[in-house]
Amino acid sequence: MFSKNRNINQFQYAMESQTEFIMYIPDAINSLIHLLDNGSIIPECFKPNLTDINGFVGNLRHLPNKITSIETGLIRQVYFHGDIMIAGSVMYLKDIETLEFICKNIGFRLSLFVEWLYDNKSLHLLESIALSFPSNDVSYLLESVMQYRQNDTTKLIFNMFPSEYNKEIILRNAVITNNLEMLEFAIEKGAILSETDHLIVQSIRTSNLDLIKYIFSHIDLSKLIKLTDTVYYIYANAVYHYSHDVIVFLIESCIDYPDDLLFKLFASNQDCHETIDYIINLKYPDQNELNNILIHICRHSSQSEKYKSVYNSVEKLIELGADFTIDNYQVVIDILKSYFPNVVEIFVKNGLNPNVNPNILKTSIYCCNNFDITKYLIDNGADIHSDPSLIKTAITSGNLKTATFLMDNGAICDESDCEIITKNRHIFDNNFS
């Protein structure tokens, strides 16, 4: 008894003082070997320090003559406190017996275990230990392996544990991971797709036309087209995860597209011009539809991620006949309030007179606060001589450069505003020729 306590004390001292180098401390190694060989358990004080113990186990491969007894004791007593990498350390040692022990008790840590196998190019070892997994864990094992697109390993595990539930696991994960080979495998094994299955919508998100065609060939399209909500979400996802070929396939499969498809294409941040042209050739939009799309694009352009997308959409809509004069030119004012005020150039090029609504110039000064846009409007005929509030608006918005330009070009300026501009003129002198 005295000897055992002495060994524990030696090992505990080594763990607490210099854990990362414990394998190089002969007394500590000998004490641990003695404890394990005599059936002792690892003292509780070591178990919380899993990182250190894991490092110790990982270094055991440097002691080939002492691997089995040390590793088995440590793994079986400490592993289940949650450190998956202890299992990883065993993989270096290729100790199948201990691995099988882990597999039988792995539970919720299984996905981490598979991740470690994948990272260390050791997934092939599952062939040797798969039968050690409890049947309840096999579905989790299949899901974990499929995340890494290990098709051969997935097939092998399924053939070891064939079941209706496991077919569905493979079917679902094949679509989620965009894996046509495993989708075909699941269908060949008898997995069934229905028209109401959420996987149909999920498949659209892959933008993989071959996978989508395969799924649609295994469902009843005559039933699908009657499911209005499902069809709506199919097209919504086809736009969000944009693929021209997928949208064309859906339409050519006689799946009627929703009324707002053209609207969604214009509102997308993707370059959807090819599909827009395709839809317009099928059915030319009426004036009201074009106007509503233009209103939305201009009003919500600040939510867009790309200037080019907004510019191209507005340009195309004007080309198609959208009326930018509606609601007293509100779309022009909306675009001036956005992150992309340069789009106003499209309206000017298509005949906009900046004076038709005095708020156009004032918005460019106050909301847009962009000197180049204001100058562009003035260069294209915007009147700066009638409204006495323009310079004050520029000063209030902090745009002294615009205020100076307005004053120098004859805009009405009261004495206090002129004084402010004069005091700050030296800042802008270099900006004017």
From Swiss-Prot:
Keyword Transcription listed: no
ANK-type repeats, residues: 166-195, 197-224, 356-386, 388-415
InterPro entries: Ankyrin_rpt-contain_sf
Matching SUPFAM superfamilies: Ankyrin repeat (SSF48403)
Keywords: ANK repeat, Repeat
Presence of the UniProt keyword Ribonucleoprotein in the record: no
Top-rank taxon, per record: Viruses
Stated name of the protein: Putative ankyrin repeat protein R578
